[in-house]
């Protein structure tokens, strides 16, 4: 909840950290040990955005290492590209169920020139592969040959995916 709406009228304040302008990388492993409070409106994420976003979202890509919403026991891993979002070719997201967010979990991606692979507590969740078809690459199927930076944030829902935030609750990730 926002303790002082006189300086900021938003009902909820959220926050996060990002490495933009301080650290980015092209290929490798990124992981974080995370736990969160499961509650209606919860929408935390650990994700990556391109350092050069000159083509705009989603054309330069986005890698969602981990997201969860509301009271779900799921961990989502997703990519956003022109291919998956604008052209609606699909195949951009998977999830793992059965997570107890009262306990810590390790969420990771391993990213190389031809694939991105998601892990939850060391267990492979899924892989997104670079196409071998030139026409698909030209349509933006794989914008992941450039540096990305990391973001870890605690957001709340607006009703679009996660339900609207409970303004009487303190969300923690």
Protein language model features and the residues they cover:
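GH16 jelly-roll
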Residues: 1-173
């Amino acid at each position: 909840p926002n303790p002082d709406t006189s300086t900021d009228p938003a009902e909820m304040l959220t926050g996060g950290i990002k490495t933009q302008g301080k650290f980015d990388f092209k290929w490798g492993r990124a992981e974080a040990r995370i736990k969160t409070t499961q509650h209606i409106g919860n929408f935390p994420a650990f994700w990556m955005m391109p350092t050069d976003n000159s083509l705009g979202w989603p054309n330069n890509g986005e890698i969602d290492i981990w997201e969860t919403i509301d009271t779900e026991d799921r961990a989502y891993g997703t990519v956003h590209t022109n291919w998956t979002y604008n052209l609606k070719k699909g195949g951009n997201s998977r999830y793992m169920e059965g997570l107890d967010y009262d306990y810590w979990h390790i969420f990771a991606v391993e990213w190389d020139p031809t694939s991105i692979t998601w892990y939850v507590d060391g267990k492979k969740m899924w892989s997104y592969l670079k196409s071998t078809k030139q026409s698909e690459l030209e349509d933006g199927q794989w914008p992941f040959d450039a540096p990305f930076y990391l973001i870890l944030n605690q957001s709340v829902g607006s009703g679009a995916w996660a339900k609207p935030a409970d303004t009487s609750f303190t969300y923690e990730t």
